[in-house]
């Protein structure tokens, strides 16, 4: 029929962001200077978000998730380094919600008596929906993740 072109099923090419974003922070704790680094690396892991038009037609939008590398230094000595992925937040957020989110940002919040503190932002692309998670890396290099209150 004549409307076949209007409903042609074509796969849309999504252009990934290839720029690595770097952040670093310096904090003092008990007279020791710590430097926390965050490297936000685009990946090829796809996140599909379904939205609906005014006519009720579903549209799948494809986004690319990030892998975030975090590390803590005291002077030139690296005390901790690890890649963080969205999969590490399973069990903290509902699976259905997590599947539509990307690991968007990470901030080094400081050092306290529990260890190195980071805060991750996971968000649903092109929406105001986001969740925060607090990451603690203990001085024994054990990591714990909790939903921010």
Where are these regions (language model features)?
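A short, structured loop/turn motif at beta-sheet edges
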Residues: 73-79, 108-114, 136-142
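A short, surface-exposed interaction/processing loop segment used at functional sites
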Residues: 141-149
